[in-house]
Design a protein with these regions (language model features):
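Compositionally biased terminal segments of proteins
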Residues: 1-197
């Protein structure tokens, strides 16, 4: 990845009023988890996607059902539509950080925990699922003073609200139970998700 290319693209998004936030490896780095990453993952509000396509015209590799993929030089950008309320909230609640002197938007800790928890629930590849779980643990363990019981509640409630079928509810509940177990191991049981009965 070319840092100058990343800075230039993010600057152009900022200058053109594109509402986005970094997620993925670069966002994890801003939350104290060093990660070697091969791409730049950006959540973008759906109504801003045409502007992104115009700004990056000529660099599109392909589109998938999940993302638009652009490559500039050696840097790949995965543009992910924030087409669900939870993803939209991640963009709207993004925090300002600095990258190479440029102010950028990064998903906040609460939304990163949710996004990684959700990703780990949806992955079919065991290695990627395990990496997402490791990321959730790292986000909490490396930021213990910033992670509140309210953040955990938000992540768990938002995940459970994604369920449309009994099977999905069981899957997401298992992930919430896993997270509560992690909090026990980290001696943070006071932050466990405990739904109101």
């Amino acid at each position: 990845m070319e840092r100058e290319t990343i800075k230039d693209v993010l600057r152009r998004l900022n200058e053109n009023g594109v509402r986005y936030c970094l997620v993925g490896g670069l966002a994890l780095a801003h939350h104290s988890i060093p990660r070697v990453t091969q791409d730049v993952d950006l959540l973008v509000l759906p109504e801003d996607l045409p502007r992104v396509e115009e700004l990056l015209k000529g660099h599109e590799l392909r589109g998938t059902s999940v993302a638009l993929i652009f490559k500039i030089g050696e840097t790949r950008f995965d543009i992910i539509p924030a087409n669900l309320r939870s993803k939209r909230q991640a963009v709207l609640n993004a925090i300002d950080e600095t990258f190479e002197g440029e102010t950028i938007k990064v998903a906040n800790l609460r939304n990163m925990i949710f996004l990684k928890l959700w990703a780990s629930s949806e992955r079919h590849e065991r290695a990627k699922r395990a990496q997402d779980e490791t990321d959730v643990i790292g986000l909490i363990e490396l930021n213990p003073e910033q992670v509140s019981a309210e953040d955990i509640e938000y992540a768990c409630r938002t995940l459970l609200a994604m369920a449309y079928t009994p099977e999905e509810m069981r899957k997401y509940q298992a992930k919430v139970d896993w997270l509560n177990g992690v909090l026990d191991e980290l001696k943070m049981a006071d932050r466990k998700y405990q739904p109101l009965s």
